[in-house]
């Protein structure tokens, strides 16, 4: 999924922010950007334009989370919804498999397991902060994985 570049929208007037400075950090983000840029029910959208503070469970410090997408879409006649969306692999949206914890010949905790615990803990902290941010504004937060993208 290491795929990165600048996205040039077909409908730059729909983008809230600088439409010449839209960066995608994965092929999945690129695919989603193309979809929402072209979709007639998407009124506006932005990518990584909002910073949400969150407390990291790793170092107990405040960091900033930049959600992949915030968008406003039409959901009915004169009815709209604002969504904050994070695009992630499904494996990063679930707690690590505890059965793989001691997956080394010496029985020590594996580096991979520790990395997965760290990633999941940080993601969970970011997403809890994002949910609160959205709740305070009447928005909805969603994590989109390869399942929703049809990959």
Regions found by a protein language model. Name each.
Residues 1-151:
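Electrostatic, structured charged patches in enzyme active sites and in nucleic-acid/phosphate-binding
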